[in-house]
Amino acid sequence: MRRTALPLLAVLLLSACGSGSAATGGKLEVIAAAYPFAWLAQQVGGPDVVVTDLVKAGAEPHDVELTPRQVGAVQRAAVVVHLKGFQPAVDDVLQGGGQGYDLGAVVGQLPDKDPHVWLDPVRMQAAATGLADRLAAKDPKHAAGYRARAKAVATALGALDTTFTTALTGCARRDIVTSHSAFGYLADRYNLVQRGISGLTPDAEPSPRRVAEVAKFAKATGVTTIFFESLVDPKVARTVAAEIGAKTAVLDPVEGVTGDDDYLSVQRRNAQALHTALGCA
């Protein structure tokens, strides 16, 4: 992954002129390191916060590079919603600061270093509650609003959890093959077995041996669909699918959305895609 490289003087100047500013027009400044965090912050913060997403819509967030202006915004923010280890450039800026709200530390992470904790609706419920507490500590005047909205989003996430549970009942298979290993939390929550063609890095090129291993696994387990992601080249997934006579379909890690989509709508499509691919009742 690439890391942010800024002249030392620029960083020092940004820090000096920007530290401590926590509100804009009476609203709390919240920086989100990627779309899922921005969605959560907006749902919980509502009209009492200004949320800025560091990643442009439709862009791949893993290798985000920060401009000097973004570095200053991170340093000024009251709260920065992020996931330690997911985006090294963001981690670098947050070192030594107390404004970071690390989802991984709040909800607990699996041991395989998969950063996609937000794909588990139950963990996102805990993240919403914790974020409300953090915002309330920074802005006690609006504490009741933060906690009420966190309760509402937790209810919506509970409904999403039910959607997945229902969709994945009575399935002919529990094995999924994905273009990269982004779905560990989803698999863990709903008792699926994930096999990623690539590892945790979405743009990593798998070796021919790895492709052959995954194809063998897919044949042995009766996999009929190879999943790829909307932000990743589907070439390798299509190669494996062609080799075993399978179909391809999108399974979205919700790293970014376009149009009228949001976290909930994309996740509901994921549930339907899995339901179809796994031959569920």
Model-derived regions: residue spans:
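Extracytoplasmic metal-acquisition and chelation regions
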Residues: 4-7, 16-281
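Hydrophobic core
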Residues: 12-14
